[in-house]
Amino acid sequence: MRPTRWRRSTHVAVGVAVLALVVAVVAAAALFTGKHSDAAEAVPPAPPPATADPGVVPVDLSAPTPTRRGLATALAAALANPDLGLITGRITDADTGAELWEQGARVPMQPASVNKVLTTAAALLTLDRDARLTTTVVAADDQPGLVVLRGGGDTTLSAAPKGTDTWYKGAARISDLADQVRARGIRVTRVRVDTSAYSGPTMAPGWDPADIDGGDIAPMESVMLDGGRTQPTTVESRRSKSPALDAGKALAAALGVEPESVTLMPSGMRGGTTIAEVQSAPLIERLRQMMNESDNVMAESIAREVAEALGRPQSFEGAVGAVLTQLRSVGIDTSGAKLVDSSGLSVDNRLTALTLDEVVNAAAGHTQPALRPLVDLLPIAGGSGTLSNRYLDTDAGRAAAGWLRAKTGSLTGTNALAGIVTDRSGRVLTFALISNNAGPTGRTAIDALAAVLRSCGCGA
């Protein structure tokens, strides 16, 4: 079959149709383009960039300073609370260092754990923030099979298995020491513990032995597990009465040696070959944990680091002397300080509000930049550490929450606070408050006293 032949009229009709289609497409395109152009011209201009008030702003150094009279008037009602017992204190301007209020600031008082402010300050003045403590295992050169766990002052070492939590963040592990020993191919038959880094008594004057079972302290030895806790992740865990021996037993068990055969070497071992070592977390991290939890064992061990750096014995007396020496070296008045430990646990300690406030003021001021981290290490009212559950029960307390930071101190009849607060006018103040012979609501009373500083403009 031949293909169908188009007639001339058919070609003309198709041509006209194509032309009409092209015209329609062009017209539609023009119409669309015109409408799009009109729409573009109708778009409103872009709005100005959004702005927001920053959540954190520098303090206003031009904010009015409270007057002595204004502060005294504002504090009067809170000071009248009989549950404060004997109350001493000092308040100063953080920027100028000017004293704004004081009451018995030079009277020696029982400080409790607020004493840790001094220990922390001395550590910051003396040691590198990244300083670590090393625990080693040494093989005896003349006694095959004998290894010695040599304590270097790390009280945070843990026997917890790998991958499990420990009380202390970044703690070194007994399991790592055991792995290193095995990697050396040494057949271990005996384990001993060298505790010679520390000297003197293991318990300070004024410590109650019952506080070991109460979970507040352990005998101070140069190596221990989880700060001497018998239950490593339990807040109220009782402490061991033989922490160094426990550490040695843990290493022995990890190496397949009978734990009950472990003995101490109080005078240390001469010579030997180091076959394993682990290191603690950096100093700044240990200070943070110590201040947040008010950890007595950590405070004592860190003070002994200061003593070692100054060439003093790592003992209670050596540590206290080293801490006070470093504070005096930067102009802190320690004349009223009579201390027998570095944690504040002893009932025999005496300290003045003047000394405490001078330390905090030096940290908040401009003259001692090495002390500045102390401000960040203070617990936050209503937010962290030993102040996490305080300042939340009253309007005045809630108003101070987040604005006030302080180290706490608590013993029977004693409550203390030393820290920093921004008042209602934006002025930064430092303070130290110590209450002895306090009544049953003494802690609440001292919190209320410090909270006044936040609500106070006190410029008149």
Curated annotation (Swiss-Prot):
EC number: 3.4.16.-
Family: Belongs to the peptidase S13 family.
List of catalytic residues: S113, K116, S294
Keywords per UniProt: Carboxypeptidase, Cell wall biogenesis/degradation, Hydrolase, Protease, Signal
Region annotated Disordered, chain positions: 39-64
SUPFAM superfamilies: beta-lactamase/transpeptidase-like
Leader peptide range in chain numbering: 1-28
Organism: Mycolicibacterium smegmatis (strain ATCC 700084 / mc(2)155) (Mycobacterium smegmatis)
PANTHER family registered for this protein in UniProt: D-ALANYL-D-ALANINE CARBOXYPEPTIDASE, PENICILLIN-SENSITIVE CARBOXYPEPTIDASE A
Protein name: Carboxypeptidase DacB
Record's keyword annotation contains Cell wall biogenesis/degradation: yes
Free-text function comment from the UniProt entry: Carboxypeptidase that cleaves terminal D-alanine from peptidoglycan in the mycobacterial cell wall. May cleave L-Lys-D-Ala and/or D-Ala-D-Ala peptide bonds. Exerts important effects on mycobacterial cell morphology and cell division.
